[in-house]
Regions:
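Helical/strand "switch-coupling" subdomains that flank nucleotide/phosphate-binding cores, especially
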Residues: 83-137
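Glycine-rich phosphate-binding loop of nucleotide-binding enzymes
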Residues: 1-97
Protein backbone atom coordinates (compact mmCIF):
# COMPACT_ATOMS: atom_id res chain seq x y z
CA UNK A 1 0.00 0.00 0.00
CA UNK A 2 1.42 3.39 -1.00
CA UNK A 3 0.37 6.34 1.12
CA UNK A 4 2.01 9.66 2.03
CA UNK A 5 5.13 8.81 -0.04
CA UNK A 6 5.69 5.73 2.13
CA UNK A 7 5.52 2.13 1.03
CA UNK A 8 3.66 -0.01 3.56
CA UNK A 9 5.31 -3.42 3.19
CA UNK A 10 4.70 -5.33 6.42
CA UNK A 11 3.24 -5.28 9.89
CA UNK A 12 4.84 -6.15 13.22
CA UNK A 13 3.62 -6.31 16.80
CA UNK A 14 4.65 -2.65 17.07
CA UNK A 15 2.59 -1.56 14.06
CA UNK A 16 3.08 -1.01 10.33
CA UNK A 17 6.49 -1.17 8.67
CA UNK A 18 7.13 1.35 5.89
CA UNK A 19 9.88 2.06 3.40
CA UNK A 20 10.31 5.73 2.60
CA UNK A 21 9.97 5.87 -1.18
CA UNK A 22 13.03 7.94 -2.01
CA UNK A 23 15.18 5.85 0.35
CA UNK A 24 14.57 2.50 -1.38
CA UNK A 25 17.51 0.87 -3.16
CA UNK A 26 17.43 -0.02 -6.83
CA UNK A 27 18.33 -3.66 -6.19
CA UNK A 28 17.25 -6.18 -3.60
CA UNK A 29 17.54 -9.80 -2.62
CA UNK A 30 14.87 -11.85 -0.88
CA UNK A 31 16.27 -15.14 0.43
CA UNK A 32 14.97 -17.87 2.71
CA UNK A 33 13.91 -21.47 3.04
CA UNK A 34 10.86 -22.97 1.34
CA UNK A 35 7.62 -21.66 2.79
CA UNK A 36 9.05 -18.58 4.50
CA UNK A 37 7.14 -16.06 2.38
CA UNK A 38 9.66 -15.00 -0.26
CA UNK A 39 7.13 -14.96 -3.10
CA UNK A 40 4.54 -13.05 -1.07
CA UNK A 41 7.21 -10.57 0.03
CA UNK A 42 8.26 -9.97 -3.59
CA UNK A 43 4.66 -9.60 -4.67
CA UNK A 44 3.86 -7.08 -1.92
CA UNK A 45 6.98 -5.05 -2.72
CA UNK A 46 6.26 -5.06 -6.46
CA UNK A 47 2.59 -4.11 -5.95
CA UNK A 48 3.55 -1.29 -3.61
CA UNK A 49 6.27 0.06 -5.89
CA UNK A 50 3.81 -0.15 -8.80
CA UNK A 51 1.29 1.94 -6.85
CA UNK A 52 4.07 4.49 -6.32
CA UNK A 53 4.77 4.56 -10.07
CA UNK A 54 8.09 2.71 -9.85
CA UNK A 55 8.63 0.03 -12.52
CA UNK A 56 9.93 -3.33 -11.27
CA UNK A 57 11.69 -6.19 -12.99
CA UNK A 58 11.48 -9.59 -11.31
CA UNK A 59 12.86 -12.87 -12.58
CA UNK A 60 10.18 -15.46 -11.92
CA UNK A 61 11.27 -18.89 -13.09
CA UNK A 62 8.15 -20.74 -11.92
CA UNK A 63 5.50 -18.14 -12.80
CA UNK A 64 4.40 -17.65 -9.18
CA UNK A 65 4.29 -13.86 -9.53
CA UNK A 66 2.19 -13.65 -12.70
CA UNK A 67 -0.99 -13.36 -10.61
CA UNK A 68 0.03 -9.82 -9.67
CA UNK A 69 -1.74 -8.72 -12.85
CA UNK A 70 -5.11 -9.87 -11.48
CA UNK A 71 -7.31 -8.04 -9.00
CA UNK A 72 -7.22 -9.81 -5.63
CA UNK A 73 -9.95 -10.07 -3.05
CA UNK A 74 -10.64 -10.44 0.63
CA UNK A 75 -10.15 -14.00 1.89
CA UNK A 76 -10.67 -15.55 5.31
CA UNK A 77 -6.88 -15.68 5.77
CA UNK A 78 -6.54 -11.95 5.04
CA UNK A 79 -9.48 -11.12 7.30
CA UNK A 80 -7.92 -13.15 10.13
CA UNK A 81 -4.48 -11.57 9.67
CA UNK A 82 -5.94 -8.05 9.55
CA UNK A 83 -7.93 -8.74 12.73
CA UNK A 84 -4.74 -9.93 14.48
CA UNK A 85 -3.04 -6.67 13.53
CA UNK A 86 -6.02 -4.42 14.25
CA UNK A 87 -6.34 -3.37 10.62
CA UNK A 88 -9.64 -2.20 9.13
CA UNK A 89 -10.44 -4.41 6.12
CA UNK A 90 -13.03 -1.95 4.79
CA UNK A 91 -10.22 0.40 3.70
CA UNK A 92 -8.41 -2.24 1.63
CA UNK A 93 -8.47 -1.64 -2.12
CA UNK A 94 -7.76 -4.50 -4.50
CA UNK A 95 -6.37 -3.86 -7.97
CA UNK A 96 -4.17 -5.57 -10.52
CA UNK A 97 -0.79 -4.19 -11.50
CA UNK A 98 0.59 -3.63 -15.00
CA UNK A 99 2.64 -6.65 -16.06
CA UNK A 100 4.77 -7.56 -19.05
CA UNK A 101 5.69 -11.22 -19.18
CA UNK A 102 8.88 -11.99 -21.07
CA UNK A 103 9.34 -15.27 -22.92
CA UNK A 104 12.68 -16.46 -24.24
CA UNK A 105 10.83 -18.27 -27.05
CA UNK A 106 8.68 -15.21 -27.87
CA UNK A 107 5.53 -17.35 -28.09
CA UNK A 108 3.59 -16.73 -24.87
CA UNK A 109 4.96 -13.37 -23.86
CA UNK A 110 7.10 -10.44 -24.86
CA UNK A 111 10.21 -11.75 -26.65
CA UNK A 112 13.31 -11.68 -24.48
CA UNK A 113 16.61 -11.23 -26.25
CA UNK A 114 19.77 -12.50 -24.62
CA UNK A 115 22.76 -14.70 -25.26
CA UNK A 116 23.28 -18.23 -23.96
CA UNK A 117 26.34 -17.01 -22.10
CA UNK A 118 24.35 -14.39 -20.16
CA UNK A 119 21.43 -16.67 -19.28
CA UNK A 120 23.01 -18.53 -16.42
CA UNK A 121 22.84 -22.20 -15.58
CA UNK A 122 19.39 -22.25 -13.94
CA UNK A 123 17.53 -20.55 -16.78
CA UNK A 124 19.38 -22.57 -19.40
CA UNK A 125 18.57 -25.82 -17.55
CA UNK A 126 14.89 -24.90 -17.46
CA UNK A 127 14.80 -24.03 -21.15
CA UNK A 128 16.44 -27.31 -22.05
CA UNK A 129 14.31 -29.25 -19.53
CA UNK A 130 17.42 -30.74 -17.91
CA UNK A 131 17.23 -32.98 -14.86
CA UNK A 132 19.21 -32.27 -11.67
CA UNK A 133 22.22 -34.33 -12.77
CA UNK A 134 22.38 -32.67 -16.18
CA UNK A 135 22.04 -29.23 -14.61
CA UNK A 136 25.02 -29.85 -12.33
CA UNK A 137 27.40 -30.61 -15.19
Amino acid sequence: MYKDKQLYVAHSANGPIHIIGNMANRHGLIAGATGTGKTVTLQVLAETFSQAGVPCFMADMKGDLSGISQTGGLSKFIEKRCAEWGMDTTTLQFEGCPVRLYDVYGKQGHPMRTTIEKMGAMLLARLMELNETQTGI
